[in-house]
């Protein structure tokens, strides 16, 4: 059975939609979590290890305050949007988690992120989380995330 961390995990799964702007703000949209789609997490000696996020994984998940950032804040601690102040909104849909981030047009860092997404220099999203419950199928080498305890961030 592959390594199963007990702490925060990071996944790079989905794409951004084409961003839009209006007179006051820059808006980025995407789906950082996609349900029921196997993703290859790693390959070791030609063997693929996969992961699936189950469709009910976000039920009872703590999503009270998560942020949109860049590269999980590794080189840039900028918070681009946040659920707590409604600059980051989300919707759980049958396909996964949809987000909409409202960026500040007057902040150069926000404009740079928006431009990078618009020009597809940044075209994937990821998320960090803690698992509450999972299962593992040794025949298919697939871990299924059944429940996510807390969502920390979605990231460009």
State where each predicted segment sits.
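A glycine-rich, hydrophobic loop/mini-helix early in the fold
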Residues: 57-97
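Short histidine-centered beta-strand/loop micro-motifs
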Residues: 42-43, 79-81, 113-116
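Polar/acidic, low-complexity leader/linker segments enriched in S/T/G and N/D
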Residues: 1-65
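Residues at the C-termini of beta-strands that transition into short coil/loop
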Residues: 34, 72, 155
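Short, charged/polar surface micro-motifs in flexible loops or helix N-caps
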Residues: 37, 73-76, 105-107, 133
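Residue microenvironments linked to proteolytic maturation
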Residues: 12-14, 20, 25-27, 86-156
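Short His-Asn-centered micro-motif
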Residues: 30-31, 70, 128-129
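Short, solvent-exposed polar/charged micro-motifs at secondary-structure junctions
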Residues: 41, 77-80, 136-139
């Amino acid at each position: 059975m592959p390594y199963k961390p007990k702490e925060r995990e990071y996944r790079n799964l989905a794409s951004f939609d084409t961003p839009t702007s209006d007179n006051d703000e820059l808006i980025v949209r995407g789906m950082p979590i996609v349900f029921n789609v196997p993703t290859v997490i790693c390959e070791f000696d030609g063997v693929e290890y996969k992961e699936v996020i189950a469709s009910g994984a976000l039920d009872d998940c703590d999503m009270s305050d998560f942020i949109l950032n860049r590269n999980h804040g590794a080189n840039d601690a900028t918070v681009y949007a946040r659920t707590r102040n409604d600059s980051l909104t989300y919707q759980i849909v049958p396909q996964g988690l949809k987000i909409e981030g409202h960026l500040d047009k007057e902040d150069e860092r926000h404009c740079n992120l928006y431009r990078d997404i618009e020009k597809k220099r940044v075209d994937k999203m990821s998320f960090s989380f803690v698992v509450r419950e999972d299962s593992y199928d040794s025949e298919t080498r697939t871990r299924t995330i059944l429940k996510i305890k807390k969502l920390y961030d979605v990231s460009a």
